[in-house]
Amino acid sequence: MKRRQLFAGVAGLAASTLLLAACGTGPNPASAPTPTEDPSGSITFWSSLAGMDKVAAAFNASQDKIKVTFETIPNGANGGYAKLSTAITAGNGPDVSTIEYPQLPQFVSNGQVVPLDGLIDKPASVDKLTDETKALVQFGDNTFGLPYDAAPMVMWYRKDMLAKAGVDVPKTWDEFEEAGKKLQAAQPGAYLASFNPNEVAASAGLAWQAGAKWFGTEGDSWKVGVNDAATQKVATYWQKLIDEKIVKVSQAYSDEWSLDLANGTVVGVVGANWSATGIQKRTEASGQKGQWIAAELPNWGSDAGAFYGGSSFNVTKSSKNPAAAAKFVEFLTTNPEAIKARGNTGSAFLAFPGLTPVAQQAYDASYFGNDIYGVFSKAYGTITPGWQWGPNWDSTNTALKDAYGKLTTGGTIREAVDTAQHATVAGLKQSGLSVTE
């Protein structure tokens, strides 16, 4: 089934999608203003991403028609999305917003971002994207943002610790388990990686890689599979790793997690391209330069991958100048000068063709023991097609986090995904949507 078919309108409206049907309202692309060829005016831009103030300044310096005023907001987990949603609802939100891919369908379903079709030069932007990156921002025939980064999920390892255990970088999940056992034997008390209860998007990525489809449609109904067969396989596998003490349950980015990386208690990270900066920050003082390497995810028998994280830029319903806002969104996501202006703010891997080398040049990767960007590129080429995010990610995310909180007191990952399945279905039904399981 083509992606556009997955979002066919439940109310029979040709331009509608199941997302927009969630609330019964939404932006009508037919009524969106057609931009002038050279839009002008003042716009506002909100983002929690580091360095975006520099990008806004570079855009302002590059032309004199549009003036961007930038405001830093907290990231989504720390209230950024609540602030954004409240402001848009009140009619005083920014012209341009930053929304991560799992959360975007929720903003679309609430009618809080507008389609960019007719506002952007699609042949020069959207049409140059891969199908996998288009799928992150397109619903039905409409484009509700332009993707900034396309974050391939990867593993990070201490190569010196693998060498001490006498193991190569695992290529399959079976090999990963065996590597963990050998690490235990060589270095008692060491863990090959950690399972992070607060990183639900990582669980989604691991399930995605295995072929899971947490959201889809069946006729005019949403089909929810947060505990589908592929997810159950992944849940059972990782529970086994926890039980065998191959991986440690710990909150990502916590003091405990950071100390475990610094002192060698945990020698691997389930992450993405953007993990590089955090790993370096937590391990550099321990003399680990040159020891950390990136690697493609172990697989289930054939090459497969997933995205983990990443953000889009969008024009909000609040915008009084959507043409100028869309012009700025194009600059943010397709112009090399935007990447240069942001500078060395992390190991970005970008969605638009040709921009990643610019980001790579700005980032100093000498801390790492292999060609990390080469690994990112390989992982990006294995993304499993067919994944889509649903319109109530908050329900799924909260339910999984809460259930994962019981993993150290007898709860299991399998129980957690079952709980999240029920919570997700209940949330969709509460929104007035038809749901099948």
Residue ranges with predicted function:
Residues 1-43, 425-437:
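Short, low-complexity disordered leader/linker segments with a strong preference
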Residues 37-49, 66-72, 95-96, 144, ...:
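Short, well-ordered beta-strand elements
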Residues 58-129, 164-171, 258-260, 264-269, ...:
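Extracytoplasmic "Venus flytrap"/periplasmic binding protein-like
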Residues 102-152, 204-207, 289-295, 436-437:
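Hinge/lid segment of periplasmic solute-binding proteins
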Residues 163, 380-437:
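Conserved C-terminal helix/tail region of periplasmic/extracytoplasmic solute-binding proteins
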Residues 180, 221-251, 297:
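Glycine-centered hinge/linker elements that transmit conformational signals in sensory
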Residues 274-288, 301-402, 435-436:
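C-terminal lobe and pocket-closing loops
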